[in-house]
Amino acid sequence: MIEVGDLKKGMFIIYDGEIYRVLEASKHFMGRGSGLIRTKLKNVKTGLVREVNFPSGDKVPEAELSFRKAQYLYRDGDHYYFMTLDDYEQYALSEEEIGDAKYYLVENMEVDLVFHEGTPIGIELPTTVELTVVETEPSFKGDTVSGGGKPAVLETGLKITVPYFIEVGDKIKVDTRTGEYVGRA
């Protein structure tokens, strides 16, 4: 059991019989009463995000998870296939289990497979990934004066804003936590 005041981003807890990843946790104190811990939790299996407020001092069970290095192999329909690097066993995860991580998966990339009681329930991505720009507006001389950026579509279907100097075919780094452009690869 872990006290809700000690919850941090990235931790896994069990709430309502389901495993959740803590996306945000902040403390709010009211006048005379005890504090309130506001959390944003993501269901590991369904990918749904919900906001839950816990009274300060409450305790929740921490999920017992294990992580194994794996390589993303391919997608077939609604399933994504991974191979663990230690024993070369293959696992399939559904699109629901993968969630938005599907926009960052490139064949042969390494990820961490998340296991609960021997069953894969999700993946952990690296902080940044390299993706190729497949669609964006052409740049014109003087575009950089206004600052900002232009929309771009990446090889995985992810739509982000990139600087004006980025062209179709460029490899760029994208932060998997925020979905934002980091730099050229």
UniProtKB/Swiss-Prot annotation:
Localization, UniProt: Cytoplasm
InterPro entries (UniProt xref): Elong-fact-P_C, NA-bd_OB-fold, Rib_uL2_dom2, Transl_elong_fac_P/YeiP, Transl_elong_KOW-like, Transl_elong_P/YeiP_cen, Transl_elong_P/YeiP_CS, Transl_elongation_fac_P
The organism of origin for this protein: Thermotoga petrophila (strain ATCC BAA-488 / DSM 13995 / JCM 10881 / RKU-1)
UniProt pathway: Protein biosynthesis; polypeptide chain elongation
Keyword set, alphabetical order: Cytoplasm, Elongation factor, Protein biosynthesis
Protein name (Swiss-Prot/TrEMBL): Elongation factor P
SUPFAM superfamilies documented for this protein: Nucleic acid-binding proteins, Translation proteins SH3-like domain
Gene Ontology terms: cellular component: cytoplasm
NCBIfam families: efp, PRK00529.1
